C-alpha cells in the first residue's frame, strides 16, 4: 500500500510459492523465468536436499530489486526504531551469500557494535562450522546443539554423562559466536521443533549457560 516506500512486489521478486490460484491447488511451486530457481545447494541448508523454500511466497535473494529493497528496509527500520541489533530468523533457508554481504554492509553503515545473530536451526557440528565459514563469521548463531544436549540430559536423568554436555556445541567450538539458550518458542510442547528441557533440569541448564567461562 506504499505506506513506507514506493516498492511494489511482483511475481518475479519471488522464486517459489505454495499455492496455484489458477488451479486452486496447494503444493511447492518453483517460479520459472530468467535467472530463477532455488538458491544453490551449498548456500542453503541441505535438509530435504535444498531447504531454500520454507513457506508462503519465497523471496528471491538473487534479484537486485529485492536486495535493494531489503537494504532500504534495514536503514528505515534502524532509523525508525533505534534498535542496536537484529535477530535474523530461519537463516538456513536464506542464501548465505546474501546474508554475508547484507550483514557486512549493515555493520559498515551502523557500526561494528551493531549486534546481529541468526537462528540457524541445525544441530550438526560440521554444518554449523561450515555456515560460519560461509558468512565469514559476520554474525553469531544460536547454539542448537547445546540446547539439544540440555534437552537430552533432562530426559535421560542419571543416565546422562554430564561431562559431555558441551560436546559438538558452538559454545565449545566457537564460544565467541555462540548464543546460548535453554528453551524458546519453537521448542515448547506442541511445536514442530518440540524439545523442551524438563523443568527439574532448567536451573542446572541456566547455570551452565550463564556461569560458563567462555
Predicted segment positions?
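Active-site-proximal helices and loops of the catalytic beta/alpha 8
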Residues: 1-16, 20, 72-214
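Core domains of carbohydrate- and sulfate-ester-processing enzymes
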Residues: 2-52
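Active-site-adjacent "subsite" loops/lids of carbohydrate-active enzymes
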Residues: 32-80, 91
